[in-house]
Amino acid sequence: MGQSTPLLVIGAGLAGSEAAWQIASAGIPVKLIEMRPCKRSPAHHSNDFAELVCSNSFGALSSDRASGLLQEELRILKSFVIKTADEHSVPAGGALAVDRNKFSSYITKKISSHPLITVQRDEIHSLPFENQISVLATGPLTSEHLAGDLKNFTGLEECHFFDAASPIIEGESIDFSLAFRASRYDKGDADYVNCPLNKDQYLKFRSELLSADQAEIKDFEKGVSNLFEGCLPIEELARRGEDTMRYGPLKPVGLWDNRWGDLHDKELRKTKRAYAVVQLRQEDKNGHLWNLVGFQTNLKWGEQKRIIRLIPGLQKAEFVRLGVMHRNTFIESPKLLNPTLQFRKRLNLLAAGQITGTEGYAAAVAGGWLAGTNAALIAMNRKPITLPETTMIGALLNFISEVSPKVKSNHKRDFQPMPPNFGLLPELNRRIRDKRCRYGAYRDRALEDIKKTQEFLEIGTPLGFKNQ
């Protein structure tokens, strides 16, 4: 390849791990720099790569859902991280959830043992030299020093929002005389644990949330007031209205305990149906650990234990991890990046992952795949690629890197993190009224176009994909 100086990837999260793997798979040496354990972030719990600090779910599996389509596109593109997620999945109804510890441990071992990847455990205080091909994948928890240098480089204030993580409890501490196993509307296996609340229990729970003590905001987080709407703390939902939680993560619809009687008895349903339901999702293969779905929180740890133990079935809950809230950083990508994920003012510097303003694990992996692929192409003096806007990955990365025709000029003035969604895709050439059928048509078009991209990349194996 003629590339003697290793490429740099800064940050070994989901995006950085994927980027480093794609570069190495192209036969190009790469140095992956990770600041842990030299410096800890407020949210990480281990030194492993690709640690999942919030949920253990990559989102819906079905390819007629936005997150599922993005995952399927990544499988076609031979994503290392998504392949690992598939291999370490745990039951989660229609979602791709993983055993987070085994998932991250496997990625760490595979990357650390790759002959073309050198791992450096160190904090980077400034951006690489201008002649160094680099991928910036430091994530939403970018260190203060590097964030400051990035601000100087871009000439823009970085953007912030608060994100939060949910508690995890031991499965053995769940009281199944009150809780029950089921998936909503009985779709698939009974993969969730459900804790039903009646109206009095729900109102008591909400009242305690509203009066609970909050954890103190750290000095470096002061002045950041905005919360990310896709990951709101449960206490914030409680503040927004009496019914907000039970129309959100605590919604009871489609959940029935067979011990209550015949589901098809309408009169029985009226009297027995839960007023609200707290759901828990499996964390590990053996079902020893469970996370509370939608229970991101910034309550003090003692308050978390006290209030969660008010939930029927969790009165003796034993906690493995408690919820935390932390600041997330992202750049104003529409002003800074090309759809190739190259910085416009320095084309050999690329960005990937949540720091670019994509939201969700699978989207971070997608950014890592494209940034790593393009870094390898640049090293080979080849033209970087973009992905078709008809694909979920292409549409999402185009959205964050330029003003979309669907989003007028205010997009640049108020840029906020964006998850994958069908609203980003260009219209079909025919009108389809039924939403599920319409999403299916989007899926078919996207998968056809992403396969063409993969076939193009495999011509002459310029990136070595066939050897993965």
UniProtKB/Swiss-Prot annotation:
EC numbers, comma separated: 2.1.1.74
Protein name according to UniProt: Methylenetetrahydrofolate--tRNA-(uracil-5-)-methyltransferase TrmFO
Protein family according to the UniProt entry: Belongs to the MnmG family. TrmFO subfamily.
GO cellular component: cytosol
Function of the protein: Catalyzes the folate-dependent formation of 5-methyl-uridine at position 54 (M-5-U54) in all tRNAs.
GO terms under biological process: tRNA methylation; tRNA wobble uridine modification
Enzyme type, top EC level: transferase
Cofactors named for this entry: FAD
Alphabetized InterPro entries for the sequence: FAD/NAD-bd_sf, MnmG-rel, MnmG_N, TrmFO
SUPFAM superfamilies documented for this protein: FAD/NAD(P)-binding domain
NCBIfam families linked: gid_trmFO (TIGR00137), PRK05335.1 (NF003739)
Compartment(s): Cytoplasm
Organism expressing this protein natively: Prochlorococcus marinus (strain SARG / CCMP1375 / SS120)
Keyword terms: Cytoplasm, FAD, Flavoprotein, Methyltransferase, NAD, NADP, Transferase, tRNA processing
One Pfam short name: GIDA
PANTHER family attached to this UniProt entry: GLUCOSE INHIBITED DIVISION PROTEIN A (PTHR11806), METHYLENETETRAHYDROFOLATE--TRNA-(URACIL-5-)-METHYLTRANSFERASE TRMFO (PTHR11806:SF2)
A GO molecular-function annotation: flavin adenine dinucleotide binding
UniProt: FAD binding residues: G11, A12, G13, L14, A15, G16
Chief place of localization: cytoplasm
